[in-house]
Swiss-Prot record:
Pfam families: NAD_Gly3P_dh_C, NAD_Gly3P_dh_N. NADPH binds at W13, R33, K105, A138, R253, E279. It comes from Halorhodospira halophila (strain DSM 244 / SL1) (Ectothiorhodospira halophila (strain DSM 244 / SL1)). This is Glycerol-3-phosphate dehydrogenase [NAD(P)+]. Belongs to the NAD-dependent glycerol-3-phosphate dehydrogenase family.
Length: 332
């Protein structure tokens, strides 16, 4: 049965997900902050600014009016950067949405906590919640290339509803109840992609890249264990799957940012060269604090934090990583 769904955030990712829902026959309202942007999307039937190679289905309409976007919807999907997430939740509070789904990846910028905590604290009554994550570049989703993702929810009925809404012969969602693990994988992989990009920018080779991905997964797993995440989640699509994609393909903004650092660019110049949101640069500090609060050792992610914050030159950080005291590969 067709639903009416609000997608809040008309960047590349929000537009790609909205296009999947629209192609599946759902009525989609794509919200952007700018009336001019909404008018252009409606007139041109494409989001030229963020996803120019993705023609939009007729069932999708764009609007800059939040009340119009939300009115009469079955559920809403948030796809804004993590830095804008809390502000949007505050704007949603008067509307008291009953079902909130998000595809934002990262930790909350003010608290350094998980996005589900922001939703629970910011909306009263607390809605049914779900998060979408996994190996999924927006351009490929928009073009209809085969993609598999994870939908984690605190409510089995909402998980099933979101899975049904997205599922087609090119987009395969899997369900999960582990919201913490799915959110964690989506946040940490961005920081690790900065590390692998920097390694490749320095010309450190394929061996180093493989080591960073593998030991990076160990860091995600250690933090996940401390936070109560399901270990299987972290070797699934939202963990290892997204990590592999983001660390090895230049469609990743985080990887391109790290590569620019490895080539000698300053943080500011590297960010400018990417030209759009680099979640890993923002998440590094929040992840550093989160790991410290839980006494979890995350040397690669900590290296990224030190480099991005300007505390340590990249070459020195790499040397310190390699010179750490030898240890067993797996913790007891």
């Amino acid at each position: 049965m067709a639903s009416t769904i609000a997608v809040l955030g008309a960047g590349a990712w929000g537009t790609a997900l909205a296009s999947v829902l629209g192609r599946n026959g759902h009525a989609v309202r794509l919200w952007t902050r700018e009336a001019e942007h909404a008018a252009a999307i409606n007139a041109e039937r494409v989001n030229q600014r963020h996803l120019p190679d993705c023609p939009l289905p007729d069932s999708l309409t764009a609007t800059a009016d939040l009340e119009t976007a939300l009115g009469g919807t079955d559920w809403l999907l948030i796809a804004v950067p993590s830095s804008a997430f809390r502000g949007l939740i505050e704007r949603l509070a008067p509307y008291r949405p009953g079902k909130v789904v998000w595809a934002t990846k990262g930790l909350e910028s003010e608290s350094g906590g998980f996005l589900h905590d922001v939703v629970q604290a910011g909306l009263d009554p607390a809605p049914a919640m779900a998060v979408i994550s996994g190996p999924s570049f927006a351009a490929e989703v928009g073009q209809g290339l085969p993609t598999a993702i994870t939908v984690a929810a605190d409510d089995a009925d909402l998980a099933a509803e979101v899975v049904r809404a997205f599922h087609n012969d090119r987009f395969r969602p899997y369900s999960s109840t582990d919201m913490t693990g799915v959110e964690l994988g989506g946040a940490v992989k961005n920081v690790l992609a900065v590390a692998t990009g920097a390694s490749d920018g320095l010309g450190l080779g394929a061996n180093a890249r493989a080591a960073l991905v593998t030991r990076g997964l160990a860091e995600i797993s250690r933090l996940g264990a401390a936070l109560g995440a399901d270990p299987q989640t972290l070797i699934g699509l939202a963990g290892m799957g997204d990590l592999l994609l983001t660390c090895t393909d230049d469609q990743s903004r985080n990887r391109r940012f790290g590569f620019a650092l490895g080539q000698g660019a300053t943080v500011e110049t590297a960010l400018a060269s990417v030209g759009s949101t680099v979640e890993g640069a923002r998440t590094a500090a929040e992840l550093h604090s989160l790991a410290e609060r839980h006494s979890v050792e995350m040397p690669i992610c900590n290296m990224v934090y030190r480099v991005v914050s300007g505390d340590t030159p990249l070459e020195q950080a790499v040397r310190e990583l390699m010179e750490r005291t030898p240890k067993a590969e797996f913790d007891d």
